[in-house]
UniProtKB/Swiss-Prot annotation:
<keyword id="KW-0464">Manganese</keyword>
<feature type="binding site">
    <location>
        <position position="146"/>
    </location>
    <ligand>
        <name>1-deoxy-D-xylulose 5-phosphate</name>
    </ligand>
</feature>
<keyword id="KW-0414">Isoprene biosynthesis</keyword>
<dbReference type="InterPro" id="IPR036169">
    <property type="entry name" value="DXPR_C_sf"/>
</dbReference>
<feature type="binding site">
    <location>
        <position position="13"/>
    </location>
    <ligand>
        <name>NADPH</name>
    </ligand>
</feature>
<feature type="binding site">
    <location>
        <position position="145"/>
    </location>
    <ligand>
        <name>1-deoxy-D-xylulose 5-phosphate</name>
    </ligand>
</feature>
<keyword id="KW-0560">Oxidoreductase</keyword>
<comment type="pathway">
    <text>Isoprenoid biosynthesis; isopentenyl diphosphate biosynthesis via DXP pathway; isopentenyl diphosphate from 1-deoxy-D-xylulose 5-phosphate: step 1/6.</text>
</comment>
<dbReference type="GO" id="GO:0070402">
    <property type="term" value="F:NADPH binding"/>
</dbReference>
<dbReference type="InterPro" id="IPR003821">
    <property type="entry name" value="DXP_reductoisomerase"/>
</dbReference>
<dbReference type="GO" id="GO:0030145">
    <property type="term" value="F:manganese ion binding"/>
</dbReference>
<feature type="binding site">
    <location>
        <position position="146"/>
    </location>
    <ligand>
        <name>Mn(2+)</name>
    </ligand>
</feature>
<dbReference type="InterPro" id="IPR036291">
    <property type="entry name" value="NAD(P)-bd_dom_sf"/>
</dbReference>
<feature type="binding site">
    <location>
        <position position="120"/>
    </location>
    <ligand>
        <name>NADPH</name>
    </ligand>
</feature>
<keyword id="KW-0521">NADP</keyword>
<feature type="binding site">
    <location>
        <position position="37"/>
    </location>
    <ligand>
        <name>NADPH</name>
    </ligand>
</feature>
<feature type="binding site">
    <location>
        <position position="36"/>
    </location>
    <ligand>
        <name>NADPH</name>
    </ligand>
</feature>
Amino acid sequence: MKNIGILGASGSVGTQGLDIIRQYPDTYKLVSFSVGKNLELANKIIEEFRPDICCVQDKEDIDKIQSSSIKVVYGNDGLMEIAAYVKNDMLLNSIMGSIGLKPTVHAIKHGIDIALANKETLVVAGEIIMQLAREYNVNIIPVDSEHSAIFQCLNGEDHKHIEKLIITASGGSFRELSREALKDVTVQDALKHPNWSMGKKITIDSATMMNKGLEVIEARWLFDMPIDKIETLLHKQSIIHSMVEFNDTSVIAQLGTPDMRMPILYAFSYPDRLARKAERLNLAEVGQLDFKAMDFDRYRCLKLAYDAISIGGTMPVVMNAVNEVVVQQFLDGEIGFLDIETIIEREMNAHDVIQSPDLETILEIDAQYKSRKYEV
């Protein structure tokens, strides 16, 4: 039996993590979890899974947890307690935003393996996180379908034989639209992703291609690859999740249906694989797989992400923080879709980069840029 903790149990990845635990009751047990303000779901999780400890967002919410048999904690300190809970064998960090960074560090320092779905952890502090993981002999297993694919392709391979990583991208909600047409798209249009079921923020990031940019930065740290050896490729079916090309010109790809439960299960079960009852990939039904070179003029946020990691230091922190704020401003109807990339680029150009920042500097800059509201 493997004991699982989940940060962000009420989110898209978190609820799918619960599905996996539900499907394998003799293999996995939920022992700790956090939710934001979704107290109704928290009570259902407690009733079904009987965990030991739960974290809610605010102190006043503690009394709304109906079970007396569970320890209830709250806020950022509560997240830290969940992350390092002594019974955790693995922590699924699916909390959104840089608030997930400190709990990741805390879990690593307590020797707990990480199933990582929180992009910001590696985007803003990848070098620090991977160094800590090596120091504490902790496995970081990616849950993003693209990074899980690369991780699987690299099983048993020698790192020095890698020629390049190829990360696929669906193109998001607006892949069929011209750039001119993007000026007038609505929030409702943006939230209709053609392939994946995801939260609002990541769906917008997929439409701008910032999501793919964040994944490029994650891959740079997860797989210790120079940025010029990480490519992106448009693949609208989301069947090939990513590929690795080796120095002998061979290419290994990982394929599957667009279902996040697959990489979650792989992270939970690694280095084993568990049989799973789910829709299986039928390539005859798919019929064809389409590929297209990435257009950096069309997807400027992806270019900004390449620029940010090439510059390094605190630049990815600024890019990520501003993106988080302006995506919310777009969702709130305050700015247009193309304003997202314009504002991010402007703020990046104005930033004085600090190289080799420590964790506190990263968090200070992150908070500084997230405290602002951005005008067009």
